Amino acid sequence: MLQYPQIDPVALRIGPLAIHWYGLMYLIGFALVYALGRRRITSGHTTSMTVRDLEDLIFYSVLGVVLGGRLGYVLFYKPAHYLANPLEIFYLWEGGMSFHGGLIGVIVVMLLFAHKKRLGFFTVSDFIAPLIPLGLAAGRLGNFINGELWGRPTDVPWAMVFPQSGDGLPRHPSQLYELGLEGIVLFALLWWYSSKPRAAGQVSAMFLMGYGAFRFLVEFTREPDNFLGLLAAGLSMGQWLSIPMVLAGAGLYLFTARPPSR
């Protein structure tokens, strides 16, 4: 069993201002997306977008992630609670974000952005899809530092006791599994896959399938939300939300891989 490194969730204090690691990881994630996106633009990987376009897209994507992530959490995980306490929807400092909701928010942003810039939607989504896993990796590291979203009890040698779980049981460090699979591995796969010309939509399809599959697998080691538990077929909410991602990605890939009709 490994010792969980209890890290102060506050990364930096400047007078009364406290900068938390979790918020800092969000900033680092978007900074990584910007840096690699800029590199792809300046290296000629795409001629459809400019650096200014990238800056605008990231700015509005931040809004999409926050609004979509919060509303997704409200609707997917605790609708009854927030229906009874609607003002708590705005209590962002108490936590409660959904990746799947954030993804929907970003998709809406990309649709509006593509329309405004007169670009094809897949031109935008195929460009940004390989960069998203870096932001996910940073976010999962933030979860680990916070000691939240821990895994299920286990006896594997690398199990950790998370103090905030309150039961003293050794658990899977599932945040690190997600960091590795949904972050680093998915980034490497998409970066390689998108390095060669692909039909419009195929890089986006690979992201949907890759993230959905990795998230579905890791959820078997992640502790279900205590207010939901496991749902139908013994699957978690995260798994049920990931299944449509895999199916949509597979459908999109097959559709875009079809030879053009004559």
Curated annotation (Swiss-Prot):
<feature type="transmembrane region" description="Helical">
    <location>
        <begin position="227"/>
        <end position="247"/>
    </location>
</feature>
<dbReference type="GO" id="GO:0005886">
    <property type="term" value="C:plasma membrane"/>
</dbReference>
<keyword id="KW-1133">Transmembrane helix</keyword>
<dbReference type="GO" id="GO:0042158">
    <property type="term" value="P:lipoprotein biosynthetic process"/>
</dbReference>
<comment type="pathway">
    <text>Protein modification; lipoprotein biosynthesis (diacylglyceryl transfer).</text>
</comment>
<comment type="similarity">
    <text>Belongs to the Lgt family.</text>
</comment>
<protein>
    <recommendedName>
        <fullName>Phosphatidylglycerol--prolipoprotein diacylglyceryl transferase</fullName>
        <ecNumber>2.5.1.145</ecNumber>
    </recommendedName>
</protein>
<feature type="binding site">
    <location>
        <position position="140"/>
    </location>
    <ligand>
        <name>a 1,2-diacyl-sn-glycero-3-phospho-(1'-sn-glycerol)</name>
    </ligand>
</feature>
<keyword id="KW-0812">Transmembrane</keyword>
<feature type="transmembrane region" description="Helical">
    <location>
        <begin position="173"/>
        <end position="193"/>
    </location>
</feature>
<feature type="transmembrane region" description="Helical">
    <location>
        <begin position="200"/>
        <end position="220"/>
    </location>
</feature>
<dbReference type="Pfam" id="PF01790">
    <property type="entry name" value="LGT"/>
</dbReference>
<keyword id="KW-1003">Cell membrane</keyword>
<feature type="transmembrane region" description="Helical">
    <location>
        <begin position="95"/>
        <end position="115"/>
    </location>
</feature>
<comment type="function">
    <text>Catalyzes the transfer of the diacylglyceryl group from phosphatidylglycerol to the sulfhydryl group of the N-terminal cysteine of a prolipoprotein, the first step in the formation of mature lipoproteins.</text>
</comment>
<dbReference type="InterPro" id="IPR001640">
    <property type="entry name" value="Lgt"/>
</dbReference>
<keyword id="KW-0808">Transferase</keyword>
<keyword id="KW-0997">Cell inner membrane</keyword>
<keyword id="KW-0472">Membrane</keyword>
<dbReference type="GO" id="GO:0008961">
    <property type="term" value="F:phosphatidylglycerol-prolipoprotein diacylglyceryl transferase activity"/>
</dbReference>
<feature type="transmembrane region" description="Helical">
    <location>
        <begin position="57"/>
        <end position="77"/>
    </location>
</feature>
<feature type="transmembrane region" description="Helical">
    <location>
        <begin position="119"/>
        <end position="139"/>
    </location>
</feature>
<feature type="transmembrane region" description="Helical">
    <location>
        <begin position="17"/>
        <end position="37"/>
    </location>
</feature>
